């Protein structure tokens, strides 16, 4: 189910140029599909713990899946870009309820402990982000509506699978308040990780959402490019990240990965008209992102003396802000200046994340 949920993030990516052409929209207008999705996802993270502690993890997962099925289907039946933007916001609400609860559920039911559960979660993220664009490209070559209906069907399958196969999990003894994630951000270690992730996500989503407009490829071709990116992300998140963490430590490896991601974005910015370089840089970035995602997710769980779901919700609330702003701003920067500029700004944002992480290193001795 997690794989399918994360497929929804990358599924729309290959069809962004198609939607722009067929609905007569500008790149920045089309990028609002990601902005509304990420903004609502981030804001909704505040309430996910409160919902889960009242109706239980299993029913929270099912509610999130139901909303994704509903709004993805509505997105496929939309007639203009404004409608799709609103439906993507509803999709983001379902996504928040699902992914915030899914990590906690995987930790509770997996047999390999927290570290093993996080690797499983990141593997699902990588597989979803690789298969999503591939499926989106194939369905998008038929119609831009295809990927929306495809997600709706797949999430309906996930809904049935969780309903049947996931055992009922007990509700937390203590009900979570909507203010608990905000209170958790008082812990400087967690706040440091969240602010770093906000800046890192700015670069991540600049790469994910604006490179389709730079490449000018068909939906199928874009699908294969991001499939390669997602496969590399999945491999490094599962097999490479744990080894690097043991060898160089969490913070040391994270500094390095952030620096490499910033350089990668800079290379894309300098070579936006060289499609071979851009494609290679996108796929290589997947490797850096995979390592970083695993390390950062693990560190967040150890950065503050609060329950894991609360730490995850607080962290996600902040970090998705970067994911919400980047797509729209990338389109605007390209319109105002040139297609090079969004990647320069993305590189600067990720580099700033290194400075934020270094400034809060004294609060991260436990990670």
Regions found by a protein language model. Name each.
Residues 190-229, 233-234:
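Extracytoplasmic gate region of multi-pass secondary transporters
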Residues 24, 56, 77-82, 111, ...:
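Helix-breaking motifs and short loop linkers at transmembrane-helix boundaries and internal kinks
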Residues 119-164:
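Helix-loop-helix hairpin linking two adjacent transmembrane segments in secondary transporters
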């Amino acid at each position: 189910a997690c794989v399918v949920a994360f497929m929804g993030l990358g599924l729309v990516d290959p069809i962004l140029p198609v939607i722009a052409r067929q609905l007569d929209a500008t790149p920045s207008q089309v990028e609002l599909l990601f902005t509304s999705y990420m903004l609502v996802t981030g804001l909704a993270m505040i309430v996910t713990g409160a919902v889960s502690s009242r109706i239980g993890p299993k029913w929270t997962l099912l509610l999130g899946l139901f909303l994704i099925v509903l709004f993805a289907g509505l997105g496929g039946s939309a007639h203009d870009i404004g409608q799709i933007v609103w439906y993507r916001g509803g999709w983001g609400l379902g996504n928040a309820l699902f992914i915030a609860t899914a990590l906690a559920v995987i930790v509770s039911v997996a047999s390999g402990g927290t570290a093993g559960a996080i690797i499983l979660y990141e593997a699902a993220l990588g597989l979803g982000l690789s298969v999503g664009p591939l499926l989106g490209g194939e369905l998008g070559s038929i119609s831009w509506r295809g990927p929306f209906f495809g997600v709706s069907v797949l999430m309906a399958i996930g809904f049935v699978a969780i309903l049947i196969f996931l055992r009922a999990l007990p509700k937390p003894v203590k009900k979570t308040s909507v203010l608990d994630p905000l209170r958790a951000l008082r812990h400087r270690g967690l706040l440091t990780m969240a602010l770093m992730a906000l800046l890192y996500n700015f670069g991540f989503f600049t790469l994910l959402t604006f490179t389709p407009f730079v490449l000018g490829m068909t939906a199928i071709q874009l699908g294969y490019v991001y499939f390669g990116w997602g496969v590399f992300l999945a491999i490094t998140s599962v097999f490479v990240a744990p080894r690097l963490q043991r060898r160089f430590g969490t913070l040391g490896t994270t500094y390095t990965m952030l620096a490499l991601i910033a350089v990668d974005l800079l290379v894309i910015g300098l070579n936006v008209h060289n499609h071979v370089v851009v494609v290679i840089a996108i796929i290589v970035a997947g490797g850096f992102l995979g390592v970083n995602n695993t390390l950062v997710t693990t560190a967040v769980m150890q950065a503050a003396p609060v329950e894991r779901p609360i730490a995850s919700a607080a962290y996600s609330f902040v970090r998705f802000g970067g994911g919400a702003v980047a797509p729209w701003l990338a389109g605007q920067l390209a319109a105002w200046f040139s297609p090079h500029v969004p990647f320069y700004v993305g590189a600067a944002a990720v580099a700033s994340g290194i400075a934020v992480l270094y400034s809060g290193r004294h609060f991260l001795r436990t990670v």
